[in-house]
């Protein structure tokens, strides 16, 4: 998995334990929005961000992400030729959602505090779960595998799962960003923020309190940010459907 190099502000690392499920990306340009871009407004009229630098806007958006009680992120990301489709809702106490690998199945993820559960479908266990035993595949299908979220192997995932840690992973005070065009993504007018030291792009709402709408990695995929501060309920799976991951090498 690639690691962010200096200047690649919006590189986001996503990892899951020893399942060989890695996703890294989000930093490059691309005309992936729903309409053609227009030049960013240069005057304050109708644009509360016009008087701010790109770095100041990014800092405000990152602060809003840190303060969010929840946020939903979704999108495809690609690493080493493998595409993963993420659909996660994050909060300060944990997250829930799915990660899918086209042709290789999918699994549900749930983190609450120091505990993490994942539940793979049959295709996942057959192709990516590290077992070719049909009996074991049948046994594991539909079961929640419980592991410790504090394991060093899971540090990247626990960072992804918390809006505060995710925002902090962008690398400290914003610097070297420039304003790009205004465009429309998912019906929202947004402002593009470009990293002058790389090809990373972020898109934020044009408001007094800008929020990330998309981080775009071009060929590496993208992540869309929606449903800020929506109610998030995290409930442990039933004990009857849970097995201890350490018993199976997780």
Q: Across the structure, where does each feature detected by a protein language model lie?
A:
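A short, amphipathic edge element
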Residues: 171-178
């Amino acid at each position: 998995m690639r690691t962010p190099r200096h200047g690649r502000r919006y590189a986001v690392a996503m990892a899951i334990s020893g399942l060989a499920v890695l996703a890294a990306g989000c930093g490059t340009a691309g005309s992936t929005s729903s309409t053609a871009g227009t030049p960013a407004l240069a005057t304050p009229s109708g644009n509360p961000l016009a008087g701010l630098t790109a770095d100041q806007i990014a800092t405000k958006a990152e602060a809003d992400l840190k303060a969010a009680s929840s946020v939903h992120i979704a999108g495809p990301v690609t690493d080493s030729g493998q595409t993963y489709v993420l659909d996660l809702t994050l909060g300060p106490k944990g997250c829930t959602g799915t990660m899918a690998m086209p042709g290789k199945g999918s699994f549900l993820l749930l983190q609450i505090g120091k505990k993490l559960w994942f539940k793979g479908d049959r295709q996942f266990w057959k192709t990516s779960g590290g077992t070719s035993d049909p009996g074991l595949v049948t046994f594991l299908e539909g079961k929640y595998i419980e592991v410790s979220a504090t394991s060093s192997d899971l540090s990247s995932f626990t960072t992804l799962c918390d809006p505060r840690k995710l925002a902090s992973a962008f690398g400290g005070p914003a610097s070297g960003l420039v304003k790009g065009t205004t465009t429309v993504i998912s019906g929202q007018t947004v402002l593009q923020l470009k990293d002058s030291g790389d090809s990373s792009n972020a898109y934020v709402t044009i408001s007094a309190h800008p929020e990330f709408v998309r981080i775009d990695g071009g060929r590496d995929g993208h992540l869309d940010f929606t449903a800020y501060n929506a109610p998030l309920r995290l409930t442990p799976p039933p004990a009857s459907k849970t097995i201890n991951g350490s018993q199976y090498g997780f």
